[in-house]
């Protein structure tokens, strides 16, 4: 089954302990925007406490500028370390990271560096995300995403054994510009998210 690998990765966790979902937004895609908002609501529905990370002021116009992107990552990661420094990860029976864009890099790097065993939802990941991606992740990508080339994302996801859901003609927000199509996309995406979160 699609989610078996994620379930196997977290099978030995204490299901009776509290559950925590951490939201890692993008630079311009905040936690109150559709993908993160509805994913958070689903997580709350399944009993997760919700914590949203905030990065503060980051460099603008980073697209296509490797130096600025690196600076943005380092600043955002530093803010993330500070925001999460008091969390006792071992006190939670289930941990879920929900991330978007540069947030997928930050979430994956944080989980890797702190050896956090949990599930991860990657909305519109960047190629750098897969440098850190761990078992128990799923990813969503639009084929018209100007921030990440589809063939590269597909190849990296296959190499890391990360289930990847492709949305034709969708941009970096998983939107097409057509309202009815976008409503259908968010519904289909959240159905996948719901099944992923609900799988023990």
Regions found by a protein language model. Give the residues of each.
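Serine-hydrolase catalytic machinery in alpha/beta-hydrolase-like enzymes
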Residues: 2-91
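Active-site nucleophile loop of the alpha/beta-hydrolase fold
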Residues: 26-27, 55, 121-129, 142-144
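Conserved alpha/beta-hydrolase fold motif
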Residues: 92-97, 120
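Gly/Ala-rich beta-loop-alpha elbow adjacent to hydrolase catalytic centers
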Residues: 95-108
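A conserved short beta-strand
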Residues: 115-126, 135-136
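Short beta-strand/loop motif that positions the catalytic acidic residue
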Residues: 133, 139-141, 145, 153
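Acidic catalytic loop of the alpha/beta-hydrolase fold
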Residues: 142-148, 172-173
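Catalytic histidine-centered segment of alpha/beta-hydrolase-like enzymes
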Residues: 170-185
